[in-house]
């Protein structure tokens, strides 16, 4: 399947399942959207890689996606990939590339206390891009920054298919430091967390607003690349890496859950 050629209007890239809610949200707005989702399991998680590693790997994946699928627009549905590689990848291809970056501007606009929590990967938290967002939009704000690699791994391994009590327990552990700090806005700055956004909001309660970048990214993607009638209906999910039966079964289930065709493995 690695040399399979198909054409899709929209391409979504992530290291794992994080970008699936973004792809799904676009298809909710445009049910017949032609879309390919590529999970780069070879390099999961991006959040503990160096900037140079992420740039090199994202470049290779994007080149493969361009060659095999000829998308009209690419969405980097991963904060770690976006803060590290967005500008580099935009210079690499002729089609628009939309990034997913921490929704700090939105968080500042929502915050009354100017005390904001950011939950992300380690490399997103420490990257200068995130520091620039804080400086540009968050003057006078106090930021509580926290990485949670454990929750990301749990979500990647299928937490969303477990009973809700188990999901809620994992999310409650993750938000406890933010509750203790008294933040009034929490930014979900890793796309994996968006899978359980409703539980984040339930756990922090009405005194805190949970924000993410999903709606803004989908709006921007459709504004830059309106759907075309000649490319309709085909929506597929690919995964990079060794042809592992457990991974295949897990991603086939994810694909079905989000209304995509499980298309198999992509060699990158």
From Swiss-Prot:
The active site is at residues 78, 190. One of its GO terms (biological process) is cell wall organization. GO terms for molecular function: glutamate racemase activity. Keywords: Cell shape, Cell wall biogenesis/degradation, Isomerase, Peptidoglycan synthesis. Pfam families: Asp_Glu_race (PF01177). Pathway: Cell wall biogenesis; peptidoglycan biosynthesis. Its EC number is 5.1.1.3. It comes from the Bacteria. The keyword Lyase does not apply. Belongs to the aspartate/glutamate racemases family. Provides the (R)-glutamate required for cell wall biosynthesis. This is Glutamate racemase. The lineage of its organism: Bacteria, Pseudomonadati, Spirochaetota, Spirochaetia, Spirochaetales.
């Amino acid at each position: 399947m690695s040399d399979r050629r198909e054409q899709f209007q929209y391409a979504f890239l992530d290291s794992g399942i994080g970008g699936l809610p973004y792809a799904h949200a676009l298809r909710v707005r445009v049910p017949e959207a032609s879309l390919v989702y590529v999970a780069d399991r070879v390099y999961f998680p991006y959040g503990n890689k160096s900037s140079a590693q992420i740039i090199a790997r994202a470049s290779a994946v994007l080149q493969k996606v361009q060659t095999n699928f000829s998308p009209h627009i690419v969405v980097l549905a991963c904060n770690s990939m976006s803060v590290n590689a967005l500008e580099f990848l935009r210079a690499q291809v002729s089609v628009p590339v939309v990034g997913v970056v921490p929704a700090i501007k939105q968080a500042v606009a929502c915050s009354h206390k100017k005390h904001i929590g950011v939950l992300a990967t380690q490399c997103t938290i420490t990257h200068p891009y995130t520091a620039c967002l804080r400086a540009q939009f968050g003057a006078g704000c106090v930021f509580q920054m926290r990485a949670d690699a454990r929750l990301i791994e749990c979500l990647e391994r299928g937490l969303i298919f477990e009973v809700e009590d188990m999901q809620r327990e994992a999310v409650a552990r993750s938000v406890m430091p933010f509750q203790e700090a008294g933040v009034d806005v929490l930014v979900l700055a890793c796309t994996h967390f968006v899978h359980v956004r409703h539980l984040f909001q339930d756990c922090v309660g009405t005194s805190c607003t949970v924000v993410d970048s999903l709606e803004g990214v989908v709006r921007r993607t459709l504004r830059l690349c309106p759907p075309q009638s000649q490319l309709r209906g085909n929506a597929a999910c690919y995964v990079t890496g060794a042809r592992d039966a457990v991974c295949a079964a897990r991603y086939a289930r994810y694909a079905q859950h989000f209304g995509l065709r499980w298309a198999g493995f992509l060699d990158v």
